[in-house]
C-alpha cells in the first residue's frame, strides 16, 4: 500500500527530532518537527488512492493533522503566548478528530463505560496538575475534557459497524498514545520536570501516524 511508503522516513525524522531535542539543537528541531508532521499528513492524504476510501473521513483526519501541525510549530517557541496558541490549536485538532469519529460511527450505550473510566482519569490528572497551573486552569480543564472525549469517540469504534476491526485498533491505540504524550508534556511543564520528557514525541508521532493510517482501511 502506497500509504506505508512514508513510514520509514517518519521513523527517521522523529528519531532525529528527539535527538536534536536532547542535544538542544534548536535549528534542527525547527526543521525536523514540522517535517515529521508533514510526512504524517502525507500518509493520510495518500489514503485518497485506497479502495473504498471515504473522502469525508479522510478530510476530517487531515483537518486534525493540519491543526496539529500548527500546534507543533507554536510549541517550538518557548513563551507563554506560543504555549497558549499551541494549546488552542491542539484542542481544535482533538475537536476535529472527535467530530470525525462521531459522525462516522455515532454513539452507543457502551460508550458510558469508557467515558466513566476517562472521567475518573481526567479528575485524577487535573488534581495532580492543579498546583502548577496558575492562571490557565480553565484552558487546561477544557483541554483535558476534549482529549478524553476524543479517546472516548475513538474507543467507540469497537462498538459500531462503521469501522473495520483494523481501523478500530488504529484509531483507539492512536488516540491513547496521543493522550499519553500530552500527559507526559503536562507533567513536565506543570508539576514535575523530568530530563527525558522529549520521549513523549515518540508517543505523539506514533499516535498521529496510527490515526493517519486509519482512512485507508475501510472494508
Q: Each predicted region: which residue ranges?
A:
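Polytopic alpha-helical membrane-helix bundles and their juxtamembrane interface segments
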Residues: 1-219
